[in-house]
């Protein structure tokens, strides 16, 4: 194992010599964490930075973590294959990025699956949630922790108060068949597009609207080039911290156990703070002059009725049992 670790160190130094040489001591397990967001404003970036700090403080001499933010090492479309090749040890792609490994995570893209973030939390921390994290083991990946961004809202170049308002509009979506079907269900034209391209596309009218969390809408200033944001809370944008099965199995038990304990503690802390971060982002949008529209119960139900038929199209991929398990956490007191 020491030979493999030395090789990992050499590879890391070759990629970013100044960072690797300064950060890691010889003999430490090098843990490269690749993600696509900034480090200080985005819930995922903040969580990754906290994890890095704690691992390097508490596991000094045993392990060394290096975080590569803003796609400086890999983007989310390439990082999982790089992980299977041993070139990166941890990543946290959005759940739609696991399409080629499992269809079960399509559950989280189904519109109005969860009533709020507490229901999401309950499901992800349940036995079914753990089984979903384990569902890619045969493909060489192990899910370790769900990280929240938050609930998704809708925005466009015109007010969106009813599903009919979306008819004929072009909406940016992540590369997810579920999200494509969701937009088609309300008469929209879904356009798959990288996150980094969205602001310019909205500004230039390449697309008319998008769906995202408050933190993303504020952080990327989408509200500046939209008529307003409608608070729909129709979906969840989350990430899965993942590692390769081979790498995890190759760690000494004490290193693996301590790493997973720290990860669990960081996850609990940052997931709780992600909700507050989104609420602050929402307030910041309003303070900056952005328009936020609320739906009354009747209006919201119209969106539910328009989008919910999407569930039937993907029940075979997601699993009826998983859908039923998720719905239990929408019930009061679950």
Which functions belong to the PLM regions below?
Residues 1-30, 333-334:
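Short, low-complexity disordered leader/linker segments with a strong preference
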Residues 23-119, 127-130, 136-334:
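N-terminal secretory/targeting leader peptides
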């Amino acid at each position: 194992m020491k030979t493999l670790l030395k090789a990992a160190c050499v590879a890391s130094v070759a990629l970013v010599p100044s960072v690797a040489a300064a950060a890691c001591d010889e003999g430490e397990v090098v843990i490269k964490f690749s993600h696509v967001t900034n480090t200080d404003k985005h819930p995922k970036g903040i969580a990754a930075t906290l994890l890095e700090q704690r691992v390097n403080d508490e596991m000094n001499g045993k392990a060394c973590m290096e975080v590569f933010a803003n796609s400086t090492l890999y983007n989310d479309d390439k990082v999982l294959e790089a992980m299977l090749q041993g070139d990166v040890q941890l990543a946290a792609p959005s759940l739609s990025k696991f399409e080629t490994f499992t269809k079960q995570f399509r559950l989280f893209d189904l519109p109005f699956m969860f009533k709020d973030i507490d229901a999401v939390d309950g499901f992800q921390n349940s036995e079914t949630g753990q089984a979903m994290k384990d569902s890619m083991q045969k493909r060489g990946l192990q899910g370790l922790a769900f990280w929240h961004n938050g609930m998704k809202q809708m925005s466009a170049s015109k007010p969106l108060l009813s599903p009919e308002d979306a008819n004929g509009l072009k909406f940016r979506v992540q590369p997810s068949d579920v999200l494509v079907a969701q937009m088609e269900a309300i008469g929209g034209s879904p356009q798959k597009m990288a996150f980094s391209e969205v602001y310019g596309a909205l500004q230039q009218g390449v697309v008319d609207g998008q769906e995202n969390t408050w933190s993303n809408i504020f952080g990327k200033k989408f509200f500046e080039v939209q008529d307003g944001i409608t608070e729909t809370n129709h979906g969840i944008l989350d990430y899965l911290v993942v590692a390769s099965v081979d790498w995890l199995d190759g760690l000494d038990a004490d290193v693996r156990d301590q790493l997973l304990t720290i990860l669990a503690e960081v996850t609990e802390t940052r997931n709780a703070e992600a909700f507050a971060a989104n609420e602050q982002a929402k307030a910041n949008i309003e303070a900056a002059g952005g328009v936020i529209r609320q739906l009354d119960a009747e209006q919201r139900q119209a969106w539910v009725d328009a989008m919910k038929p999407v569930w039937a199209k993907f029940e075979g991929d997601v699993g009826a049992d998983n859908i039923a398990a998720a719905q239990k956490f929408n019930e009061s007191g679950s």
